[in-house]
Amino acid sequence: MGSFLKSFRKDVGSAAPSVGAPPAKKEPQPLPMTPLEKMLTELGPIRGDGSDKFYGMENFGNTCYCNSILQCLYYSVPFREAVLNYPKRTPIEDLEAALAKALRYQDPNARLEAEALAEKQKAANSPRPGQPPNPQQKPEDKDSPEYKKKLALQTLPLLETTDNSVSYGIPESLFSSLKDMFESIVGSQSRIGIIRPQHFLEVLRRENEMFRTAMHQDAHEFLNLLLNEVVVDVEKAAAKLLESPQPASDVSDSVIPSSSSGSRTPNTTRWVHELFEGLLTSETQCLTCEKASQRDEVFLDLSVDLEQHSSVTSCLRKFSAEEMLCERNKFHCDNCGGLQEAEKRMKIKRLPRILALHLKRFKYTEDLQRLQKLFHRVVYPYHLRLFNTTDDAEDPDRLYELYAVVVHIGGGPYHGHYVSIIKTQDRGWLLFDDEMVEPVDKNYVRNFFGDKPGLACAYVLFYQETTMEAVMKEQEQENTEPPVEVNASTLKQNGFSSSATLAHAHSASQVPTYEDHDRFTGLKRAPTAPQLSTHPEHTTTDSESLPSPAPDPAPLTSLPPIPPIPETPPAPLTSRKSDLQSKKERVKEEKERKAAEKEKEKQRRKEIETRLKDRQRREDDDLKAALEASKVSKEDEDRRNHAENGTSKKNAGGLGRFRSLSQRLSTKESRTSLSRIPPLPNGNHTLSKVPDESEQTHPKSPTPPAPLSRPASQPLNDDLLGSPRADTLAVPTEQEHIKNSKHDRSSHGKWRSFSLRKKSFNILSS
């Protein structure tokens, strides 16, 4: 037993390390592969066009608005090629040699040292036994975007950019710094890394005071400013290049078309206009003279108003809806020469190759006196056709595909964060969040329609032109790919579940359940998508991605009809082409039908105007006939009065019969006063009996009394009737008659004028 213990102690002593020996150096453990690295493992050699480079961009303090827009512009193939080719393309060998020192690889031991230092600080700050734990100290989540960004800065290659405007032959500007960034990414020897756009931001802040502060900026404003600045810088560079003549070899190599990308790069200074510029036509039609006037204006992006529970199609329809110009907003018509009511509408006359749609999420409210974010649900399709075009538009049936989405995360316009989801050339959809770049599935793009406050919302949509053949080819590839298994780790990679700053943007791509399938079935009727076999927004609801239930044994007998499947692919292609042709025919028929309806409406209006003019002419003729009849009746009455009373035409008129009545009364009174005159030589004829005063004062009827009867061959003695004696005798009797009959309705002036008006109206109506 003693010998055994001695030998045991001896073995233990020999196995113990010597006290003075140094500890063994810790070997650096290999980092686990990121999802992006796993995706790029099977790629071949590096391409020379930069389409297989996936670089994040370092955030220098609220510069996410800049990073998201720059990423969208870089992955636009025609825009990237145009920037690289103007004024001339730098050879790839020169780029690689110049960027050999600019690309800085990280030391893997530095990360271990940083982690060891962090662990030591954590151990020093840890509470001692018996002390309560610090509630503010939380364990770091390795799945959060912040941790992934920090890890990327410590491990991925860093790419510095410098000013190379002298080699381009143009002055330093925002365009030259943008070209520096694009050339740095294209010429780098690493597919992944982080680029530092520090020089670009310095030029931006030097030339634009609005971006000098570290405040939250608007991504759409930056896009608009960048495109306009690029246009100005390119025109200045072209003017400088014209002043300094170049050799013929340099001029011939100024634009090198890229055969790998297949994009047609413009070789003029208007390549920005040819890519992003469209033409809007404002049609205004005067409602008075029906003359239409047009005014054209260019645009680099379209800003559309939003409505709750709508789509991009409905927003564009509202954008081109008819607007009534009335009241204070009347239209000045040159044809009418004044302000008139009019109808105004906006239509697209020329479509751009790259369509940037700005969803107006920020609206000024009068109550709050500030901008407020709208969390309206707006559905956007993967493929889009614009319908609000003019009849003479160039290529009105152009098909667009969604290739980039800029997302705003936050509750208001004055704070938040911007990220971009971009469809790459052959690697699918990627999420660019400053330094972090991760692959996402196609359905992840649908998470930013925006229907709840606090969630991420799509802010700028980038559509690029495509063809129906390319869409069909892409769908065939998607149908042949095996279904991807979605597990918890995939959800962590695609979402923002544990981020402190992006926690409100939790929009991980999940496998939809059958309830989700029922909820999204209404989107199948979106009119903006092309007539394809499967709507792009519902690919996850197919049997490929949904877990299908276990089939019954009975349906297994239906398996033999499967062999004819390889013969079916050509059939849908023919039917789709025929559908496209039939759709074009339907569009043409619709245009012809609308033109026919418009012509019919115009003809109907002319007929209505003709009928109105005829009726007005008939009314004028009737009025003239009534006036002529009134004149004839007036002349007849004048002749009758003249024949009965012997009055002259001077007294004839509207009041002639009343004047003759007073004259007859005065004549009667004068004749009664001459009753003592001896009889005339012809004794056979005597004057008729003169009515008494009572009969004159109270007549039995309102009709005037009959004239005195006398022979027509025996005229009155005018000298005797006109003598002063006769006037003296007749005046008191006439005054007495007026005094006695002033209360009589038939003799009052008011009633006489009323009977006159009534008589005139009867004549006109007859």
Swiss-Prot record:
Q: Which residues form the USP domain?
A: 55-466
Q: According to its UniProt record, which reaction does this protein catalyse?
A: Thiol-dependent hydrolysis of ester, thioester, amide, peptide and isopeptide bonds formed by the C-terminal Gly of ubiquitin (a 76-residue protein attached to proteins as an intracellular targeting signal)
The keyword Cell cycle appears for this protein: no
UniProt feature, compositional bias: Low complexity: 13-23, 249-263
Parts forming coiled coils: 573-620
Which processes are annotated in GO (biological process)? carbon catabolite repression of transcription; protein deubiquitination; regulation of protein stability; ubiquitin-dependent protein catabolic process
Q: Out of the domains of life, which is the source?
A: Eukaryota
Pro residues composition bias: residue spans: 548-572
Disordered: where is this region?
1-32, 115-145, 243-266, 526-752
Keywords, sorted A to Z: Coiled coil, Hydrolase, Protease, Thiol protease, Ubl conjugation pathway
GO annotation, cellular component aspect = cytosol; nucleus
> Active site located where?
C64 (nucleophile), H417 (proton acceptor)
What's one GO MF term for it? cysteine-type deubiquitinase activity
Q: Name one Pfam family in it.
A: UCH
- Ranges of compositional bias, category Basic and acidic residues: 576-643, 734-747
- EC identifiers of the protein: 3.4.19.12
Family, similarity comment: Belongs to the peptidase C19 family.
> Which function does this protein serve?
Ubiquitin thioesterase component of the regulatory network controlling carbon source utilization through ubiquitination and deubiquitination involving creA, creB, creC, creD and acrB. Deubiquitinates the creA catabolic repressor and the quinate permease qutD. Also plays a role in response to carbon starvation and the control of extracellular proteases activity.
Q: How does it assemble?
A: Interacts with creA, creC and qutD.
From the Swiss-Prot or TrEMBL record, give the protein name: Ubiquitin carboxyl-terminal hydrolase creB
Q: Which organism is it from?
A: Emericella nidulans (strain FGSC A4 / ATCC 38163 / CBS 112.46 / NRRL 194 / M139) (Aspergillus nidulans)
Gene symbol here is creB
